[in-house]
Curated annotation (Swiss-Prot):
Provenance organism: Salinispora tropica (strain ATCC BAA-916 / DSM 44818 / JCM 13857 / NBRC 105044 / CNB-440)
GO MF terms held by the record: methionyl-tRNA formyltransferase activity
Gene name of the encoded protein: fmt
GO cellular component: cytosol
Record's catalysed reaction(s): L-methionyl-tRNA(fMet) + (6R)-10-formyltetrahydrofolate = N-formyl-L-methionyl-tRNA(fMet) + (6S)-5,6,7,8-tetrahydrofolate + H(+)
PANTHER family: METHIONYL-TRNA FORMYLTRANSFERASE, METHIONYL-TRNA FORMYLTRANSFERASE, MITOCHONDRIAL
NCBIfam families: fmt
Keyword Ligase: no
EC number(s) stated in the UniProt entry for this protein: 2.1.2.9
Protein keywords: Protein biosynthesis, Transferase
Regions that span the bilayer: none
Protein name: Methionyl-tRNA formyltransferase
Length: 308
């Protein structure tokens, strides 16, 4: 089939590479426009756009996919199908109807669970033990289309959202290629999503990434892992923001108030609503990440001081 790949962030690149290596004819890539990045805020190509440039593939970057010029180019390219991974913009009906097999989206959850922009983060934040990826027919609703297939993945105790997303990016790419092959062969079957089990996964904000020391230890651990690497878990110490690395659940341990710090010889503990957690790395503003014990010695944590 003639296909145009739609995607933007780095997590979409494994699927783009798989599509390019498949039996299908990749005629163009659709991605979000170049955006300011880095300290200089210069315009930067999306990871998907950069990959396509390196491989000599046409890149389409409409500000809005309803623009007449884009729709005209889409018709001229005449794709049979448009596979999508995290494109980042709503696709209007006028664009959805151009490919004869429509737009087929890879989403990183077991739909109808966690519809929205941050499915992996919400799976970790809510303590899911099993998650996965789904390939479904894109339609106007938010991740509501019929599902062609799924792949599952067990959540590991130390998984961050980055870890889990990396695994799903590769297993999901294999799933999407299998669905494209089945569509071409006429054997693909999409099943409507059930009405039960629907949950939403809006993008996590910087405010969401602030650690709540008044939560139980398991919830603190989930939030830290869900927000790693982005938007990045953080807290405050002496009214200054610091970023946190992984934390470790501690069996038993001393009784500490929520956020209260205890510096021991080889570890730093922080209190929660239940048992303490052991802090891993800490990065103060303008500094490199360092082991929590080194940070505590450097700032000279005193008895009773707290993270907030």
């Amino acid at each position: 089939m003639r296909v145009i790949f739609a995607g933007t962030p780095a997590v979409a690149v494994p699927t783009l590479a798989a599509v390019a290596a498949s039996r299908h004819d990749l005629v163009a890539v659709l991605t979000r426009p170049d955006a300011p990045a880095g300290r200089g805020r210069g315009l930067s190509r999306s990871p998907v756009g950069a990959w396509a440039d390196e491989h000599g593939i046409e890149v389409l970057t409409p500000a809005r996919p309803r623009e007449p010029e884009f729709l005209d180019r889409l018709r001229a390219l005449a794709p049979d199908c448009v596979p999508v991974v995290a494109y980042g913009a709503l696709v209007p009906p006028a664009a959805l109807e151009i490919p004869r097999h429509g737009w087929v989206n890879l989403h990183f959850s077991l739909l109808p669970a966690w519809r929205g922009a941050a499915p992996v983060q919400h799976a970790l934040l809510h303590g899911d033990e099993l998650t996965g990826a789904s390939v479904f027919q894109l339609e106007e609703g938010l991740d509501t289309g019929p599902v062609y297939g799924t792949v599952t993945d067990e959540v590991r105790p130390a998984d961050t959202s980055g870890d889990l997303l990396e695994r799903l990016a590769h297993s999901g790419a294999e799933l999407l290629i299998a669905v494209l092959d089945a569509i071409e062969e006429g054997s693909a079957r999409a099943e409507p999503q059930p009405n039960d089990g629907v949950s939403l996964a809006p993008k996590l904000t910087v405010a969401d990434a602030r650690v709540r020391w008044g939560d139980p230890a398991f919830a603190v651990d989930r939030r830290v892992r869900a927000c790693s690497p982005a938007p990045g878990p953080w807290t405050t110490f002496r009214d200054e923001r610091v970023k946190l690395g992984p934390v470790t659940l501690v069996a038993g341990g001393p009784e500490l108030r929520p956020g209260e710090l205890l510096v021991e010889k080889s570890r730093v503990l922080a209190g929660t609503a239940s048992t303490p957690v052991q802090l891993g790395e800490i990065r103060a503003a303008g500094k490199k990440a360092m082991p929590a014990s080194d940070w505590a010695r450097g700032v000279r944590v005193t008895a009773g001081e707290v993270l907030a």
